[in-house]
Amino acid sequence: QPQKCQREFQQEQHLRACQQWIRQQLAGSPFQSGPQEGPWLREQCCNELYQEDQVCVCPTLKQAAKSVRVQGQHGPFQSTRIYQIAKNLPNVCNMKQIGTCPFIAIPFFP
């Protein structure tokens, strides 16, 4: 299972659009990179998730969140936000059968 999801994560280029979407949400200003970016990014991110095997959606989102956190040198508060944004993405993408990912939004796990 983990290997398979790891592979999907790599195939989907580490959910690049989802990582950008998370960053954008974190910054709290969707207009930073132009207003047309927000909805477009969300759509791209959702498409990345739709490509994946359902069982991999949450594990790969967790990886994406981790990448964002590691790249950004975020403090504990922001780290928590990153995971909260990531775990809610299946809802944002209307993936009702997945809903909110079960991983916990805490900053300190590896």
UniProtKB/Swiss-Prot annotation:
UniProt cross-references to InterPro entries, sorted A to Z: Bifun_inhib/LTP/seed_sf (IPR036312), Bifunc_inhib/LTP/seed_store (IPR016140), Napin/2SS/CON (IPR000617)
Any one GO molecular function term: nutrient reservoir activity
Residues carrying Pyrrolidone carboxylic acid: 32
Domain of life from the UniProt record: Eukaryota
Keywords: Disulfide bond, Pyrrolidone carboxylic acid, Seed storage protein, Storage protein
Pfam families the record matches: Tryp_alpha_amyl
UniProt-listed Gene3D superfamilies: Plant lipid-transfer and hydrophobic proteins
UniProt-recorded name of the protein: Napin-1A
Source organism: Brassica napus
